[in-house]
Amino acid sequence: MSHRVLVIGSGGREHAICWKLSQSPKVAQIYALPGSHGIQLVEKCRNLDAKTLDPKDFEAIAKWSKENQIALVVVGPEDPLALGLGDVLQSAGIPCFGPGKQGAQIEADKKWAKDFMLRHGIPTARYESFTDTEKAKAFIRSAPYPALVVKAAGLAAGKGVVVAANAKEACQAVDEILGDLKYGQAGATLVVEELLEGEEVSVLAFTDGKSVRAMLPAQDHKRLGNGDTGPNTGGMGAYCPCPLISQPALELVQKAVLERAVQGLIKERINYQGVLYAGLMLTRDGPRVLEFNCRFGDPETQVILPLLESDLFDVMEACCSGKLDKIPLQWRNGVSAVGVILASAGYPETSTKGCIISGLPAANTPTQLVFHSGLAVNAQKEALTNGGRVLIAIALDGSLKEAAAKATKLAGSISFSGSGAQYRTDIAQKAFKIASASTPGLSYKDSGVDIDAGDALVQRIKPLSRGTQRPGVIGGLGGFGGLFRLKELTYKEPVIAEATQGVGAKIHLALTHEFYENVGYDLFALAANDVLEVGAEPVAFLDYIACGKLQVPLAAQLVKGMADGCRDARCALVGGETAEMPSLYAPGQHDMAGYCVGIVEHSRILPRFDLYQPGDLLIGLPSSGLHCAGFNEILTQLAASKVNLRERSPVDGGDDGLTLAHVLATPTQLYVQQLLPHLQKGDEIKSVAHVTHGLLNDILRLLPDGFETTLDFGAVPVPKIFGWLAGKLKLSAQTILERHNCGIGMVLILPQSSQLWRTSLPGAKVLGVLQRRSKVSGSPVQVRNFVEQLEKVASPFGGLGDRELPEELKKLPSNSDLSAPREECFENAAGRRLTRIPTHYKDPILILGTDGVGTKLKIAQQTNRNTSVGIDLVAMCVNDILCNGAEPISFSSYYACGHWQEQLAKGVHSGVQEGARQANSSFIDSHSAALPLLYEPQVYDLAGFALGIAEHTGILPLLAEIQPGDVLIGLPSSGVHSNGFSLVHAVLKRVGLGLHDKAPFSDKTLGEELLVPTKIYVKALSTLLSRGKHGIKALAHITGGGLSENIPRVLRKDLAVRLDANKFQLPPVFAWLAAAGNISSTELQRTYNCGLGMVLVVAPTEVEDVLKELRYPQRAAVVGEVVARKDPKKSQVVVQNFEASLARTQKMLSQRRKRVAVLISGTGSNLQALIDATRDSAQGIHADVVLVISNKPGVLGLQRATQAGIPSLVISHKDFASREVYDAELTRNLKAARVDLICLAGFMRVLSAPFVREWRGRLVNIHPSLLPKYPGLHVQKQALEAGEKESGCTVHFVDEGVDTGAIIVQAAVPILPDDDEDSLTQRIHKAEHWAFPRALAMLVNGTALISPEVSSQ
């Protein structure tokens, strides 16, 4: 529905309001009373002169509005509001954007306004009001605060305020304003205020009288001259948004100023709708209100409204109808507007009229605006000065500094004849001077993450890793994964077993009491003991360490403990990951996870339930203490009971001077040396259970259906530490059985006749005997004599109680739809997943990788969008092992949290499983634990472990073969991926943006953008890597350390690379981060992927073959080359044109997003490609598909539009008399939707010449051939019949001919020997889905242009 609007006023503010309202498709006509020359030039606008309507005759305005069906009256200046225009209009039933006379008092009567603030607790300066000059001056001289601000209580056109330098000046102002009535009756009452110190900021807000919504903060410049010198004016310039007010301060203004004011008006029964303007001083004690205004500010309006994305008519209508809380209020992010006022000579005391103005731009543009404040036109159509403030020159840019420079330059290009113009050249300077002085550029180290410390740790633990090497290990630490060669072992039919473990809250004990090596040993022992359960030999181990602040000596001791365990088990420590996450972990906090890979002969896999016989023995091997079970609750309860763990132990070890902490921290017993030789013989041990979930629970895992047993502790003493624990915490015997190992760390099933437990397993005890199950009900495990044994050791410490302990380890069900394994994966008799080596590998190399998601998790937790981080986890791990040429085979994860929330954990877990599916990997298992001592209630951490296999001859990188001249091919990233998020958090904090705020670089929220999952490159690369000769010499996953640190991992020291940033897209998120955080280009390249998620090093002769596989589906491109490194001191990575690319992207963000219409006639597959591309911010297409038009009803393309939430129209050509009439209707609808660009995507209509001319340079088509060959229809048939070797597609400008317009992009597709029309068409479609978005990007960023007069480039 189209509406008519009346705007009252004639200045720059009203010009800006009319300009913004004209952009609303709901507004058909705007009348301005009395208006101005500039307003008259705005589309849809028309001036009303005083002869038609007297601006001071309110009744006549109301009557005219009724007669002319005015839907809304917008009052610009304060005077009509103060005189009651709003009341007259409301009485006549005409919606008025602006308050009535009572509401306008908030500006019109400064005494009333100050009293109002006092009544409602709104923070403001101290004050007194006077009608007597002598009393006012006496107060100034005696006030207990600097009473130096003198204000006329009434309206004085923004000039009735004097900020005096001293009491003498203030008294002089009293004499002028009150004594001489310089501003007439406006100064008959005087307000004398305290002089506040700080920066002034304007916060304007929309209100409907019930709710109030703040606009972006702005800063006005009141003084006439540079450096805030000279007299006060109505305002000499402004900029928006103003960075001087922080987000917390803005939130305080919302609550303590705006909301209190609206509530105060409600309490005083004053109806108020329109703008509530708060002029603020940012003092050391917080924001204080200097004044309220009842209307838009001038010149703030002129820099605020260009940043408003919402429809201004909708907002104003909502204010007048009490529905402001029902509409979204959206602003352009990442853009600043700066306006410089040009005033006539003599202003503010007088104004020089009639001076000729020259240099005015011909028209406003999206980045440059001029609004008229006091400008007239003579008979010769020359622009003349016609007031004090004549016009405002405005520039918009992604950089505040650039916007200020451009606005000042624009002002300087405009001149007034005669005495010339007055304008300031320092508008906004204060903001960026303060910003640059107080906010130096952020770095990753500033955000709490020290890459150098991580590198130092790697160097420190390399010798520890080397000390664990064994037959099979290839390479060392510092690459992308750990490598192990199976051929060096003696297995005939090897099967892979995997185990993931954590040490729980025992790490809290270790950190508190500095038992770092002990807990590192624990971690390895738990994982290695787990693989023994299937009869496997532990051969390789990875660790994951997470912390708030990396302390290299501490982390090195943790790893030393792991390395000691590895040596004891003859298992190799092949790699690990250290994650420094200051926003997830407090300084000093740590957690760890471990992953062990074992190998077992297929015929030796345990358990062998099929061999069980009644009479078989349950043999228990002694534990070394509590191991790692239940420490979260143990430590919590002991602390609550005020037990001092530094006291000498009253149980084991106390006689040797050990403290309780020493005893509790005793490392987990490692059983590899004891058991592995007997497991590999395979003749006696039928089953193994590692006791980690409590003795009772783990014995249950040994019993298949049909068997039971009775555990008898008559001859099995319980270690004293369990008695002490039960006595101190008043635990029940059942809880000790269910939550702790009771002195038994491993349980075996042996034949009744076996003597193994007597001869070869020191300390082994018979716990029970297997029996056939006699009854279905009841537990298959009964226990005798345990209570008695436990009571013996508990009685010295108070005896047993009835307290229970919660389960710390959690089990999550797998989603069968997502967790379907590869065919090599199978389950043993106990349901544990194992993996056969795929038969096509002749010399298989196991490749292991681990990683986490970093503080990206914090964003998931804060936005409650937790599913996608599981995909990130898989991506980070599998992308790493791809770099060694691996085929990902399996994946395991670790999940630890503060408070167990099952639905949350399931959501995270489903994401991990989805990632494993995308990576074509079997999901093996997740170790999950609730650890309140380590994590806050809503916090969790994730670690992942990937296993892949490569043929020995296919291992990457081929370091010796990489040479200068080799080509770099880049695969684009999907955004930030999962590294550098600590720096992201620091930037968000600096700029005061929240995760639910709209992203400054897209239409999504920041949370949505930052949580886009890391791209998994398995599908992209697996086909290539599976070929014997693929031409790829190296792959570099651009992960933590960015471009600068990851590409060198696949280079010799004598080589470097030269990248060209013009050849790959820098995702806008990085341009925004750089600007918002003042991050240097070097730091950006050292922290982030900058748009390249994976870099391939390819022999020059193989480039085309590689690109044939990757260009269209993956948007791969040549991005650089390998060069000789001439200076060993210089970086191995040089990125040319990076600054230019960065500036180009930042400039793009400062511009309005282009609005695109797509015209279709059918399925709309290219429409879908355009929608997907424009909604993927990483592709950097600064545009949105806003309208879809089809000439046919019911086609699939319309469904695609509906599913994407894009408005669509069916405009059938059959309903129109001629092609020209039909096309005119298209144009009408396109203009109503404010469309900038049109894409023809299978639109089966020949467009008329007038339509083509109307949209020339903004109208493009995609054609399924390599033009100029085969224009028109049936092009695939023509190409096949002609025996062509290749075909493809062309995106071109549309002109009056048939497919003759200038070409923008072409994409070639080979024609294969067995191709028919259908197969060739399908392959061309894939090329089209690459080419069309690429062409649109060129069109949007201005690299594809065509002259309006010609049809070829």
UniProtKB/Swiss-Prot annotation:
Reactions performed catalytically: 5-phospho-beta-D-ribosylamine + glycine + ATP = N(1)-(5-phospho-beta-D-ribosyl)glycinamide + ADP + phosphate + H(+); 2-formamido-N(1)-(5-O-phospho-beta-D-ribosyl)acetamidine + ATP = 5-amino-1-(5-phospho-beta-D-ribosyl)imidazole + ADP + phosphate + H(+); N(1)-(5-phospho-beta-D-ribosyl)glycinamide + (6R)-10-formyltetrahydrofolate = N(2)-formyl-N(1)-(5-phospho-beta-D-ribosyl)glycinamide + (6S)-5,6,7,8-tetrahydrofolate + H(+)
EC numbers on record: 6.3.4.13, 6.3.3.1, 2.1.2.2
Annotated positions binding N(1)-(5-phospho-beta-D-ribosyl)glycinamide: G1164, S1165, N1166, H1325, K1326, A1327, E1328
GART domain as annotated region, ranges: 1153-1353
Cofactors required: Mg(2+); Mn(2+)
Site entry (Raises pKa of active site His), positions: D1299
Active site annotation, chain numbering: H1263 (proton donor)
CC per GO annotation: cytosol
GO molecular function: ATP binding; metal ion binding; phosphoribosylamine-glycine ligase activity; phosphoribosylformylglycinamidine cyclo-ligase activity; phosphoribosylglycinamide formyltransferase activity
Positions with a binding annotation for (6R)-10-formyltetrahydrofolate: R1219, M1244, R1245, V1246, L1247, N1261, D1295, E1296, G1297, V1298, D1299
SUPFAM superfamilies, alphabetized: Formyltransferase, Glutathione synthetase ATP-binding domain-like, PreATP-grasp domain, PurM C-terminal domain-like, PurM N-terminal domain-like, Rudiment single hybrid motif
Functional note: Trifunctional enzyme that catalyzes three distinct reactions as part of the 'de novo' inosine monophosphate biosynthetic pathway.
Assembly and oligomerization: Homodimer.
Entry note about domains: The N-terminal ATP-grasp domain carries the phosphoribosylamine--glycine ligase activity.
Family per record: In the N-terminal section; belongs to the GARS family.
Record protein name field: Trifunctional purine biosynthetic protein adenosine-3
Protein source organism: Drosophila melanogaster
Biological classification of the source: Eukaryota, Metazoa, Ecdysozoa, Arthropoda, Hexapoda
